[in-house]
């Protein structure tokens, strides 16, 4: 009986905050090198084969058991005793089809592809957490899943990972993620309880008309003029049909038509995005986009084929208890003065929402901005940079969050 008590005490001996911070800082350069390797070789959604291999090889070196090829390139490592309680930490791995314009030594080696959303940082920080947690596995009473997922950037990799059972066996009870943010100072963390990020949808409108010579527009049904009217009129859906107190966005971001200056083309293609704080709001806007586009096309003797390709992401909603826990864990690493309680949601979207539809969770932003090194740009910008001092801080926050969550669940 005494031996059992002693063993239970050893299993539940909590790592001190100073230990978490120092052990994370000790491997800072290791984390940075992982990040830079991934940054040099960006891979788009569902093509993260080399990144996945790097994750697998690292977990193998750390003697962490893992499952691979989940959602094509996803990897899930497991630390702990394999029993309940179980929490998960998640990182995404995919890059963006953006040509990098920074001057960093380790910039993308692949033209037209860049880690402009910080997923290289997310993967490296979680690998850092894996190393620290594995070295202290004897202090873990429960199970920690490390979810490395593909295709956050529009591919709904989180949805596929969820459908393939990453939240089961053992069942995940809480899930946490960090996302770097270039517009808040390095060493700060921002989030809120409740709705944090919007539900999203893509838009594709193909306007079909009748082409002809530009000097004889009366013999054509001009899809360019018609498409332009559609773009303008869609903005009135937000300004005149939505409740002014209900956030919503319709942005047309791509317009393609024609190949010669003196020819009216027969088609014009429009693409864009819809954002709302509810999936019902997205559905309502989709309905009205279709009605408006088709009506304007008909009035101009054209046709409009309207579709919403890809995946409609649900809103990302932070569980109140998970945010309080995450905030407490971050405060112990960063200091209370470096926590930002966001007053409002933002209209970006995240497929982390697919996990929090199933289990309570919390998604937070980790500041990586620093004007001294020109790290002033937001994500999805070709000049996006990060202050890498944030990486070991992110690792420490992951570790502390995981241990506190298991402690509370126990």
Q: Where is each model-derived feature located?
A:
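Metal-dependent amide/peptide-bond hydrolase catalytic core
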Residues: 225-410
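Acidic/His- and Gly-rich active-site-bordering loop/insert found
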Residues: 10-115, 124-141
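Solvent-exposed residues in well-ordered beta-strands and their adjoining turns
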Residues: 80, 92-94, 149, 206-210, ...
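Alpha-helix C-terminal capping segments
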Residues: 128-136, 168, 299, 356-358
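N-terminal amphipathic/basic-hydrophobic helices that include classical n-h-c signal peptides
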Residues: 1-13
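Histidine/acidic-residue-rich, glycine-tolerant segments that coordinate divalent metal ions
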Residues: 76, 96-98, 103-114, 121, ...
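Non-cysteine beta-strand/loop elements that form the S-adenosyl-L-methionine
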Residues: 88-90, 99, 203-205, 363-368
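Divalent metal-coordination and catalytic microenvironments
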Residues: 38, 77, 89, 119, ...
């Amino acid at each position: 009986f005494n031996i059992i008590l002693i063993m239970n005490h050893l299993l539940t001996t909590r790592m001190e905050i100073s230990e978490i911070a120092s052990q994370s800082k000790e491997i800072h350069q290791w984390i940075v090198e992982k990040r830079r390797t991934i940054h040099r070789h960006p891979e788009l959604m569902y093509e993260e084969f080399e990144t996945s291999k790097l994750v697998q090889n690292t977990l193998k070196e750390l003697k962490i058991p893992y499952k691979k090829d989940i959602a094509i390139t996803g990897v899930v490592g497991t630390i702990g005793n394999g029993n309940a309680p179980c929490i998960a930490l998640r990182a995404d791995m995919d890059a963006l089809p953006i040509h990098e314009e920074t001057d960093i030594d380790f910039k993308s080696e692949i033209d037209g592809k860049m880690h402009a959303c910080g997923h290289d940082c997310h993967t490296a920080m979680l690998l850092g957490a894996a190393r620290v947690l594995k070295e202290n596995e004897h202090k873990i009473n429960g199970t920690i899943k490390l979810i490395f997922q593909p295709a956050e950037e529009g591919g709904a990799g989180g949805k596929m990972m969820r459908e393939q059972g990453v939240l089961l066996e053992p069942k995940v009870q809480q899930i946490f993620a960090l996302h770097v943010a270039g517009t808040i100072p390095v060493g700060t963390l921002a989030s809120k309880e409740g709705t944090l990020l919007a539900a999203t949808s893509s838009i594709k409108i193909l306007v079909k008309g009748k082409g002809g010579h530009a000097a004889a527009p009366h013999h054509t049904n001009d899809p360019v003029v018609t498409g332009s009217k559609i773009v303008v009129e869609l903005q009135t859906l937000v300004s005149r049909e939505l409740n002014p107190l209900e956030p919503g966005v319709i942005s047309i971001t791509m317009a393609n038509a024609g190949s010669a200056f003196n020819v009216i083309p027969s088609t014009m293609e429009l693409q864009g995005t819809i954002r709302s704080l509810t999936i019902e709001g997205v559905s309502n806007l989709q309905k009205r986009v279709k009605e408006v586009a088709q009506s304007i096309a008909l009035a101009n003797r054209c046709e409009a084929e309207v579709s919403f390709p890809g995946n409609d992401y649900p809103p990302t909603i932070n569980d109140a208890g998970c945010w309080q826990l995450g905030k407490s864990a971050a405060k112990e690493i960063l200091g209370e003065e470096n926590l930002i309680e966001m007053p409002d949601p933002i209209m970006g979207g995240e497929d982390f929402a697919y996990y929090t539809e199933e289990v309570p969770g919390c998604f937070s932003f980790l500041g990586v901005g620093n004007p001294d090194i020109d790290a002033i740009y937001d994500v999805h910008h070709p000049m996006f940079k990060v202050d890498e001092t944030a990486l070991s801080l992110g690792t420490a926050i992951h570790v502390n969050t995981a241990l506190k969550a298991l402690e509370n669940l126990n």
